[in-house]
Structures are given as C-alpha cells and as structure tokens.
Amino acid sequence: HQQCINNRICYNAQVDLAGNVSIKLVRGNFVSEENPLFFKQLLSGVDIGQSDSSAKQMANFIYIIGDKNTRECVIVDPAWDIDGILNVIETEEMKLKGSLVTHYHPDHVGGSIFGMNITGLAELMEKNSAPVYVNKHEAEGLKQVTGLSDSDLRLTDSEEVLSIGSIDITFLHTPGHTPGSQCFRVGDSLVAGDTLFLQGCGRVDLPGGDSEVMYDTLTRRLAKIQDEVVLYPGHNYGGKPSAPMGNVRETNSYLQIKSLEDWLGIMGG
C-alpha cells in the first residue's frame, strides 16, 4: 500500500509470504491521500517525449495540478509531447480544464526556437480546447509564438485566484525573464517557470528580458514567499526536482546579491 512522508515522498510497500518487505518510491506525486491536491511533475525527455533528444537536453518541467475529488486539472506549460501529457492525464483519470502559461518561450508553450519545432499549445487546443491562462502582459507574445487567438486566452493579473475544484491557484506576476512571466502558488508549493531555479534565475538577455525588473522580482515580489514553501522550477537545472525556498535562499547565489548596483554589474542592464 502507498504511504507518504511529510505529504511529499510517497512509496509503495509490499510484504511477501516470507516476510520480506519491498519498497518502491512513487516519482512525481507529492501529496498524501488525505490531501485533495493532485500535483504531478513531468520531465521532458524522461517522463514524456522520451524519444526526443532536444526534449531531454532542454529538461523542461511540465506540471499537472488538480483536485483528486472532482478529477479536474490544469497543465502548466504543456510542450514537447502533447500526446504523452494527455496520456498521463487519462491514466490518472483526470479531466483537463485548462492550461497555465508561465511565459511565452517556445520550450514552454510550443513553437520554433534554436532550429527546433516544438509541439505545444497549438496542438493541445486541437485535441482539447480548454482555456489558456496567461498574464495580460504576455498575451501578445504568446499569440505570436503559438498562433492562438484572443478567444483562446484568459488574461490574468497578479494575486488573482483560479479554483480547480477545491484547489486554489494564485497567479503571481514575476516579470524580468519576460514582461508577463508568472508563478503559481498552490498551497505550500510555488511553480516558478523560468523566474527562479534552484541554482539560478531566468536569463535577462533575451527579447523582453529586463535585468533591473528581474532584481525587483527576486528581492521584493518573491521575498514574501515563506521558507517552507517548496520551489518547483521550469527546468531541471539544479540536480533536484524541487527544494524549499529556505534552502534555495541559502544556496542560490543570485538571491544573495545585496544591491541593484552589484546585480547590474553581474547580470548587465
């Protein structure tokens, strides 16, 4: 039967006729059976898109968040293998109600980048035309990259809340990597896209990036996130899939830069 430690590390334990105990970790589900939150982390090139070398190289995290009682869910940053993502949702017996966009870069939403044509929201909408939630400052960029129309989008603002069943998802506008980058607060989890990684932050030298705005996001906008909240990033750059914000603050050198002047000297601006 399945057991969970601290609602995060889940495992199946079995005892054979000789009394031997075997334990198998359950990867990706980080909540207990008592908690209605459904939260699953997928890694491109590993959990989905296994045959795509670019998916493995880019190491994007995709998230499925929902309510285990109503079986409703949303996808965060659907890309690389839409059929694979939908197969996971079907296997989990969930119903897709929408997609959440952290930012408009093609490795997160589909499109062309670095000579790669990545499947994403355009293909998903052909199979399931549920609303796409994107920050109001990111909508134009998203439409250009994916070909979606205004009618496909639901524009979000900071501190707005989307309820999926009994699960509340709070949108947090965290610009810097792009003008409309956003994070999602779900209980004691923060899904951060490319705003913040375990060992770094999103680039500010790409179109729409702003070094000074990123510094404000990291030092002010995310400062209120409690140490015990677990950071779930947009890429597997840190060697681990997640970490408490308190640990990230201790080990991420980008969060230890004390002044805007020092920041601009390192990051440019």
Name each model-derived stretch.
Residues 4-73, 80-92, 123, 128:
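Zn-dependent metallo-beta-lactamase
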Residues 38-46, 74-77, 168-175, 190-193:
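Active-site-proximal beta-strand elements of phosphoester/diester hydrolases
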Residues 53-55, 152-153, 173-175:
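Short Gly/Pro-enriched turn/cap motifs at secondary-structure boundaries
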Residues 58, 81-168, 250-254, 258:
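Active-site HxH/HxHxD metal-binding segment of metal-dependent hydrolases
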Residues 65-69, 164, 184-187:
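Active-site beta-strand termini and strand-to-loop segments that position acidic
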Residues 70, 80, 106, 138, ...:
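Short, glycine/acidic-enriched loop or turn micro-motifs at the edges of active sites
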Residues 76, 97-105, 133-135, 174-176, ...:
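Active-site neighborhood of phospho(di)ester-bond hydrolases with catalytic His/Asp-centered motifs
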Residues 145, 168-173, 178-267:
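Metallo-beta-lactamase
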